[in-house]
Protein backbone atom coordinates (compact mmCIF):
# COMPACT_ATOMS: atom_id res chain seq x y z
CA UNK A 1 0.00 0.00 0.00
CA UNK A 2 2.81 2.40 0.92
CA UNK A 3 4.66 1.68 -2.32
CA UNK A 4 1.57 2.06 -4.50
CA UNK A 5 0.58 5.28 -2.75
CA UNK A 6 4.03 6.71 -3.41
CA UNK A 7 3.81 5.68 -7.07
CA UNK A 8 0.45 7.44 -7.35
CA UNK A 9 1.73 10.58 -5.63
CA UNK A 10 -0.61 10.11 -2.65
CA UNK A 11 0.52 11.18 0.81
CA UNK A 12 0.73 8.18 3.15
CA UNK A 13 0.76 8.57 6.95
CA UNK A 14 1.81 5.48 9.01
CA UNK A 15 -0.91 5.96 11.65
CA UNK A 16 -0.95 2.30 12.69
CA UNK A 17 1.73 0.69 10.59
CA UNK A 18 2.43 -2.01 13.20
CA UNK A 19 -1.17 -3.18 12.73
CA UNK A 20 -1.04 -2.82 8.96
CA UNK A 21 -2.94 0.47 8.88
CA UNK A 22 -1.92 3.61 7.02
CA UNK A 23 -3.86 6.78 6.28
CA UNK A 24 -3.92 8.07 2.71
CA UNK A 25 -4.61 11.77 2.18
CA UNK A 26 -6.58 12.26 -1.05
CA UNK A 27 -7.68 15.79 -1.96
CA UNK A 28 -7.36 16.74 1.69
CA UNK A 29 -9.52 13.86 2.94
CA UNK A 30 -8.07 11.02 5.10
CA UNK A 31 -8.78 7.39 4.19
CA UNK A 32 -7.60 4.54 6.42
CA UNK A 33 -6.30 1.50 4.55
CA UNK A 34 -5.57 -1.73 6.41
CA UNK A 35 -3.95 -4.90 5.11
CA UNK A 36 -5.97 -8.11 5.46
CA UNK A 37 -5.29 -9.72 8.84
CA UNK A 38 -5.79 -12.87 10.89
CA UNK A 39 -5.71 -13.03 14.70
CA UNK A 40 -2.75 -15.03 16.02
CA UNK A 41 -3.25 -14.32 19.72
CA UNK A 42 -5.69 -12.17 21.72
CA UNK A 43 -5.24 -10.57 25.12
CA UNK A 44 -8.64 -9.07 25.99
CA UNK A 45 -7.31 -5.67 24.94
CA UNK A 46 -5.62 -5.88 21.55
CA UNK A 47 -4.79 -8.80 19.32
CA UNK A 48 -1.51 -10.02 17.87
CA UNK A 49 -2.17 -10.36 14.16
CA UNK A 50 -0.60 -11.81 11.05
CA UNK A 51 -1.11 -10.26 7.63
CA UNK A 52 -2.90 -12.41 5.09
CA UNK A 53 -4.70 -12.59 1.75
CA UNK A 54 -8.03 -14.21 2.70
CA UNK A 55 -11.01 -11.84 2.70
CA UNK A 56 -13.25 -14.32 4.53
CA UNK A 57 -10.77 -14.80 7.38
CA UNK A 58 -10.35 -11.04 7.64
CA UNK A 59 -14.13 -10.65 7.86
CA UNK A 60 -14.54 -13.38 10.47
CA UNK A 61 -12.05 -11.73 12.87
CA UNK A 62 -14.07 -8.52 13.04
CA UNK A 63 -16.50 -7.59 15.79
CA UNK A 64 -19.92 -7.09 14.17
CA UNK A 65 -21.49 -8.43 11.00
CA UNK A 66 -22.14 -4.90 9.73
CA UNK A 67 -18.40 -4.19 9.97
CA UNK A 68 -17.38 -7.15 7.83
CA UNK A 69 -18.62 -6.18 4.37
CA UNK A 70 -16.21 -5.61 1.52
CA UNK A 71 -16.71 -4.21 -1.96
CA UNK A 72 -14.73 -4.63 -5.17
CA UNK A 73 -13.64 -1.78 -7.39
CA UNK A 74 -16.63 -2.46 -9.67
CA UNK A 75 -19.17 -2.25 -6.86
CA UNK A 76 -19.78 -5.92 -6.02
CA UNK A 77 -20.46 -6.39 -2.29
CA UNK A 78 -19.07 -9.45 -0.52
CA UNK A 79 -20.84 -10.50 2.68
CA UNK A 80 -19.50 -13.59 4.45
CA UNK A 81 -21.33 -13.25 7.78
CA UNK A 82 -24.82 -11.87 7.15
CA UNK A 83 -23.99 -8.21 7.61
CA UNK A 84 -26.14 -6.95 4.75
CA UNK A 85 -29.32 -8.40 6.27
CA UNK A 86 -28.38 -6.96 9.67
CA UNK A 87 -27.93 -3.50 8.15
CA UNK A 88 -31.37 -3.76 6.55
CA UNK A 89 -32.84 -4.77 9.93
CA UNK A 90 -30.88 -2.08 11.85
CA UNK A 91 -29.47 -4.89 13.97
CA UNK A 92 -26.02 -4.95 15.63
CA UNK A 93 -24.84 -8.53 16.02
CA UNK A 94 -21.49 -10.08 16.93
CA UNK A 95 -19.81 -12.40 14.44
CA UNK A 96 -19.85 -16.01 15.64
CA UNK A 97 -19.61 -16.42 19.40
CA UNK A 98 -20.35 -13.09 21.10
CA UNK A 99 -18.48 -14.19 24.21
CA UNK A 100 -15.39 -15.09 22.21
CA UNK A 101 -15.44 -11.80 20.29
CA UNK A 102 -15.66 -9.89 23.57
CA UNK A 103 -12.88 -11.89 25.23
CA UNK A 104 -10.61 -10.95 22.31
CA UNK A 105 -11.00 -7.25 23.18
CA UNK A 106 -13.27 -6.05 25.98
CA UNK A 107 -13.64 -2.67 24.28
CA UNK A 108 -16.13 -4.48 22.05
CA UNK A 109 -18.63 -4.28 24.92
CA UNK A 110 -18.66 -0.50 24.59
CA UNK A 111 -18.62 -0.70 20.81
CA UNK A 112 -21.71 -2.94 20.92
CA UNK A 113 -23.65 -0.23 22.73
CA UNK A 114 -22.23 2.58 20.58
CA UNK A 115 -23.02 0.89 17.30
CA UNK A 116 -26.56 0.09 18.42
CA UNK A 117 -27.02 3.68 19.59
CA UNK A 118 -25.79 4.97 16.23
CA UNK A 119 -27.17 2.44 13.75
CA UNK A 120 -29.50 0.07 15.57
CA UNK A 121 -33.23 0.14 16.16
CA UNK A 122 -35.46 -1.44 18.78
CA UNK A 123 -34.20 -3.90 21.36
CA UNK A 124 -30.55 -4.84 21.66
CA UNK A 125 -29.54 -8.24 20.30
CA UNK A 126 -30.26 -10.53 23.26
CA UNK A 127 -27.27 -12.82 22.72
CA UNK A 128 -24.88 -9.90 22.42
CA UNK A 129 -26.30 -8.14 25.46
CA UNK A 130 -26.04 -11.28 27.60
CA UNK A 131 -22.41 -11.73 26.53
CA UNK A 132 -21.63 -8.11 27.43
CA UNK A 133 -23.08 -8.60 30.90
CA UNK A 134 -21.15 -11.85 31.36
CA UNK A 135 -17.89 -10.22 30.26
CA UNK A 136 -18.27 -6.86 32.01
CA UNK A 137 -15.50 -7.65 34.51
CA UNK A 138 -13.02 -7.40 31.64
CA UNK A 139 -13.70 -3.68 31.31
CA UNK A 140 -11.23 -3.11 34.14
CA UNK A 141 -8.45 -4.32 31.81
CA UNK A 142 -8.99 -1.45 29.39
CA UNK A 143 -6.95 1.73 29.48
CA UNK A 144 -8.72 4.91 30.45
CA UNK A 145 -7.86 6.47 27.09
CA UNK A 146 -9.69 3.73 25.18
CA UNK A 147 -12.71 3.92 27.47
CA UNK A 148 -12.86 7.71 27.15
CA UNK A 149 -12.59 7.67 23.36
CA UNK A 150 -15.32 5.06 22.97
CA UNK A 151 -17.68 6.57 25.56
CA UNK A 152 -17.31 10.06 24.10
CA UNK A 153 -18.36 8.67 20.71
CA UNK A 154 -21.29 6.83 22.30
CA UNK A 155 -22.53 9.86 24.23
CA UNK A 156 -23.12 11.93 21.08
CA UNK A 157 -25.06 9.29 19.13
CA UNK A 158 -28.78 9.63 18.43
CA UNK A 159 -29.58 6.69 20.70
CA UNK A 160 -27.24 7.59 23.55
CA UNK A 161 -29.94 7.96 26.22
CA UNK A 162 -31.45 4.52 25.63
CA UNK A 163 -28.04 2.85 25.31
CA UNK A 164 -26.81 4.36 28.57
CA UNK A 165 -30.01 3.31 30.33
CA UNK A 166 -29.49 -0.30 29.24
CA UNK A 167 -25.81 -0.10 30.24
CA UNK A 168 -26.86 1.07 33.69
CA UNK A 169 -29.36 -1.78 34.08
CA UNK A 170 -26.63 -4.21 32.99
CA UNK A 171 -24.25 -3.00 35.70
CA UNK A 172 -21.71 -1.51 33.30
CA UNK A 173 -21.81 2.15 34.28
CA UNK A 174 -20.75 1.53 37.85
CA UNK A 175 -17.61 -0.15 36.51
CA UNK A 176 -16.94 2.56 33.93
CA UNK A 177 -17.70 5.62 36.05
CA UNK A 178 -16.62 4.37 39.46
CA UNK A 179 -19.83 5.63 41.07
CA UNK A 180 -23.60 5.73 40.71
CA UNK A 181 -24.74 7.09 37.34
CA UNK A 182 -27.90 9.08 36.60
CA UNK A 183 -29.28 7.95 33.21
CA UNK A 184 -32.49 9.98 33.68
CA UNK A 185 -30.38 13.15 33.96
CA UNK A 186 -28.80 12.37 30.60
CA UNK A 187 -32.31 12.23 29.12
CA UNK A 188 -32.92 15.70 30.56
CA UNK A 189 -29.67 17.08 29.19
CA UNK A 190 -30.42 15.79 25.69
CA UNK A 191 -33.87 17.42 25.81
CA UNK A 192 -32.28 20.67 26.96
CA UNK A 193 -29.78 20.56 24.08
CA UNK A 194 -32.61 20.00 21.61
CA UNK A 195 -34.65 22.87 23.05
CA UNK A 196 -31.70 25.27 22.95
CA UNK A 197 -30.44 24.11 19.57
CA UNK A 198 -27.10 22.95 20.97
CA UNK A 199 -24.95 20.37 19.23
CA UNK A 200 -24.35 17.14 21.20
CA UNK A 201 -21.36 17.56 23.51
CA UNK A 202 -19.75 14.52 25.17
CA UNK A 203 -18.38 16.42 28.18
CA UNK A 204 -21.70 18.12 28.83
CA UNK A 205 -23.54 14.82 28.55
CA UNK A 206 -20.99 13.07 30.75
CA UNK A 207 -21.55 15.76 33.36
CA UNK A 208 -25.29 15.12 33.33
CA UNK A 209 -24.75 11.38 33.57
CA UNK A 210 -22.02 11.28 36.18
CA UNK A 211 -21.17 12.01 39.72
CA UNK A 212 -21.93 14.50 42.47
CA UNK A 213 -19.39 13.11 44.94
CA UNK A 214 -16.12 15.00 44.40
CA UNK A 215 -13.88 12.01 45.18
CA UNK A 216 -15.74 9.89 42.62
CA UNK A 217 -15.48 12.68 40.05
CA UNK A 218 -11.75 13.00 40.61
CA UNK A 219 -11.31 9.25 40.13
CA UNK A 220 -13.33 9.44 36.92
CA UNK A 221 -11.20 12.29 35.57
CA UNK A 222 -8.05 10.35 36.39
CA UNK A 223 -9.31 7.01 35.09
CA UNK A 224 -10.58 8.43 31.80
CA UNK A 225 -7.56 10.71 31.40
CA UNK A 226 -9.77 13.78 31.03
CA UNK A 227 -7.86 16.95 30.22
CA UNK A 228 -7.88 19.71 32.82
CA UNK A 229 -10.28 21.70 30.63
CA UNK A 230 -12.64 18.73 30.26
CA UNK A 231 -12.57 18.00 33.99
CA UNK A 232 -13.35 21.63 34.86
CA UNK A 233 -16.15 21.79 32.29
CA UNK A 234 -17.67 18.57 33.60
CA UNK A 235 -17.56 19.88 37.17
CA UNK A 236 -19.08 23.25 36.26
CA UNK A 237 -22.00 21.60 34.45
CA UNK A 238 -22.62 19.14 37.30
CA UNK A 239 -23.34 21.92 39.79
CA UNK A 240 -25.56 23.89 37.39
CA UNK A 241 -27.69 21.10 35.96
CA UNK A 242 -30.81 20.09 37.97
CA UNK A 243 -31.11 16.37 38.71
Residue ranges and their predicted role:
Residues 1-243:
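Catalytic cores of the polymerase beta-like nucleotidyltransferase superfamily
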Amino acid sequence: VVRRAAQAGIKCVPTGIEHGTVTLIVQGHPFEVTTLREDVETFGRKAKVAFGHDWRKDAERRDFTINALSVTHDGIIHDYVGGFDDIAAARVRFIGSAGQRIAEDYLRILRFFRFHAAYGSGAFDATGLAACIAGRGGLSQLSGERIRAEMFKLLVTKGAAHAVEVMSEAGLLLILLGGVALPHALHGMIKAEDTLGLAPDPVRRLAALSLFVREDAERLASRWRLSNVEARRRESVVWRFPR
